[in-house]
Structures are given as structure tokens and as C-alpha cells.
């Protein structure tokens, strides 16, 4: 019988659909609902050590419309989770007992070698199936920077050498060889070059893309930013359907030029979007923004739609489908 089983960096997934690190994975109740709906994996919202625990101000999210269609894009100035690494550890251990066939991925952000090492140890102790390292959040760069250093120095995803050395630090910290996923940003001049740093550092997989850096705009009546807290705002990240072409471009560049598994994320709203990422070489598909609009149950129609497509096109497995469209992409 045809199924959606696929391996990602050596880890078997019941299906490729994974809840991305986001508000949708930021509580035990939300994770429970996503698992009941049928998601194959969960990336818990990114966490850090207590000294970096944010105090989230609201409002920090807003939808953007285009041609009368609401939430054509989504903009946020959200930060990492307010939950502690201990809470994430507890949830990983708890859900692995209840859902041994699903995959639980801890997402971490750190400032400096000692912090990366401690966070990796914590996630391995909890039994995380994989570790996703957030090195690229466009609105989180200042909140996690090493004291006394420029924020740019805390963003490995923008520099090949820093990416290489940071990834090496993370890999050396492992005691159980838990697969490490490095999350990439599109906000760089040469994505493939920076990604090579992660590969050189020993990363097991890449996740692409993080949100696209931007600014929501100004209310012309008041002069204030459209999304503000007491009149003040900052630069944030754009997600949703509007960024899908950017994500597809980034994922396909990585899968075509590098020999490393890639998780695709960015603008996935239905099975058709997911199929495009798979055809361009992604072995895992993460969803963030669409869940806030359609709910966790959207994964059921995604599974059914993808299975129908595979049957119609004669793909006996997802392995047969992954990367099938890559040969059609050529340089000018």
C-alpha cells in the first residue's frame, strides 16, 4: 500500500509534514493537537538559556493583504519562546512516550560555544530525534548577541566561516550523534556559499528558509509603524504565500549544488505547495504561517492530496518523487 514514509538525515518520518518552530509549537496543548491531527514531526519553538529569555510585547504579528486576499503574507516581530529549555525537555520526553512513531525536534539559539554545548546536551538528554539550530532569525539577532559584540557576529547564517566553526562546536557537543539541522536565512548574498560552511562543519541537514527580513510599513494618518508597541516597532520577518518563490529558489539552489538533505519551509499552504518542494529536492516540508489560518487539521488534506498525486503520476514512494524536477533547472 502506498504511503508517505520518508527518511530525513537518516531519521524515518511517518510523513514529511512537520510543524515548524513557531507559535504553533509553543505549548504542550498545541503540540498535542498537532499530533492528533497527524503531523509527522514537530519542531518546538526556538528556545535559549534563561539569560536570553525574552519578554514578548504585543501586538507582534499582522497579516498583509494583496488584491483583496487577506494574509497573502504574514509579518512578525516575534522573538524566541518564553518557555525554558527544561519545559522543552519535559515535553519531548512526554510526547515520545505517547507518539513513538513521530519525530520531535528541539530548536535552539545560543550566544557562544558554552551555550550551544549546554543546549545540545539538554536536548539529547530528553531524547530529541533531531536538533535544529536557529542561526538566522531576522528579528532575533540583537536579543541573542554576545554581550559586547556586534549583533552581526551572532548570526552564523550570514557568514561561511562563522557557520563552519559554530556547526563544528555543535557537532562536537553531541554525545549521541543526534542529527543536527542548520536553519538557513534567505537574507544573504550567496546562500550556497554560507551553506557550504554548515556542510564543512558537519551538519547532517539544512532547513530553508527562515523568514524574509523586512518592515511592515507606516500608517500614513499617524506616522507610526503599522505594527507597533506603544508607538515603537522594529524590523521583522515576512512569511506566508508571498515568500514561497523565494523559498523554492533557495531550496532548489541548495539541493542542486550541495549533497545534504534539506527541509523546505516558506509559504506552504496546501499539498500542491508541499509537492513543489519535494520535486525540487526537499525531503521534509515544514509549515508555519498556514497553520495559524487553517488549523492543525490541514495536514489531513495535505496527506490525502499528496497520495493522490503520487498515484496519478506513478510515484511508488516519496523517494521516487524527491528531486524529480531538478534536472529542468539550468543556469542562464
Region locations from a protein language model:
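Alpha/beta enzyme core
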Residues: 32-37, 41, 111-263, 271-285, ...
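Flexible, active-site-proximal loop/turn residues at the rims of small-molecule/cofactor binding pockets
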Residues: 23, 48, 137, 212, ...
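Short beta->alpha connector loops at strand-helix junctions that form conserved
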Residues: 45-46, 266, 288-289
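Short beta->alpha connector loops
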Residues: 22-27, 110-113, 186-190, 268, ...
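Extended, intrinsically disordered, low-complexity segments
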Residues: 64-71, 244, 304-332
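C-terminal helical cap(s) of enzyme catalytic domains, especially alpha/beta-barrels
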Residues: 51-67, 217-235, 278, 290-315
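N-terminal capping/small domains of soluble enzymes
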Residues: 1-104, 110-114, 302
